[in-house]
């Protein structure tokens, strides 16, 4: 990592609280912006498709969750490339960086091929899981097209690892904003049929998703192939040649990261399945509340990525004073933002929900009323979700991935999902019970991960003395 990036992420000297605040924002804002823009793409699709009715919106919720679960597990291996490339970059070793990136792309291609049968059988899987056959059919048609966008999306994630490692994360924000604008304009045209083009409905949104993901990959390839600081890596020279050490390193680092991310994401996907079993209205309302919560989550997620860099650099320097101060500041920023978001969700839930469904539709009143009650619970959910996300980032900065993955699995599934099902069905709370299970599961994760981080820092401080 270049000295300029280190200077931005870990303040020199005494490391005042203000310098930590400033450094966190300098690193975190572009990452947060990129996350928000990425989520905005799916949010735009929901807003547009929601105008077609509750059934189409419910199908869009399932399709988005289905695609995201498959994507996010594969992206964990792409995330693993970042520290490998960063270390090679710091050593001036372009060859090792190129090999890591190449093997990261190999893994992405292999993963996409392995995932194709899941997409081909999406409708059958959803019907088996108790979803409404009509909703499952709409979802299956969408995913039959969207599967072609998975590969460029994964490859883009690998190459953004190089861009981040050399301190050029701003380009990720720029390309994601372009993707957001392209997606909104093209989806509006193809879904409803404007400028002489036929109305394609949900399938139009799927076509646009493929185009936008392909554009992002082509854009970042052009960037790394033409910029002086990146074209020296010669990423596609002898692309066919394997490097088994780099390949196994990507797999070794990526698996626990993928498991950690997937454990939380699949909790939400499973909750959508539970909601679908309760009813179409509840599933549509759940999708609205979940999308709002997901938008808010992009802020602690961006801060989590910043936390990994800042704590990792401080630990490498053996500077525990700045490590602790950086951690406290990131916690403070995350909690402050979550509290503001929670107040907003509690104050105007119906206003927020109306963005996702045309109030004039016959079923809109029932969906919006139910969604408003879930949005209030989502306000509480924000705080604990933000804490556990930031703490996971701090632990990655200490290169601690295996134990957090285990803690996440325990918190999300045996605790969170089990309680969600129990409160929804045996206890009779319905969809609200699912969300209460969310809150308890993520609260457990927040506590366990925070305890793990505190104990680990104390142990490493003791060892360093």
Curated annotation (Swiss-Prot):
Pfam families: MatE. Keywords: Antiport, Cell inner membrane, Cell membrane, Ion transport, Membrane, Transmembrane, Transmembrane helix, Transport. GO terms for molecular function: antiporter activity; xenobiotic transmembrane transporter activity. GO terms for cellular component: plasma membrane. The keyword Nucleotide-binding does not apply. The keyword Transmembrane applies. It is a multi-pass membrane protein. GO terms for biological process: monoatomic ion transport. It comes from the Bacteria. It is found in: Cell inner membrane. Its main location: membrane. The chain crosses the membrane at residues 61-83, 104-126, 141-163, 170-192, 202-224, 251-273, 283-305, 326-348, 368-390, 403-425, 435-457. Belongs to the multi antimicrobial extrusion (MATE) (TC 2.A.66.1) family. Multidrug efflux pump. This is Probable multidrug resistance protein NorM. It comes from Agrobacterium fabrum (strain C58 / ATCC 33970). The gene is norM.
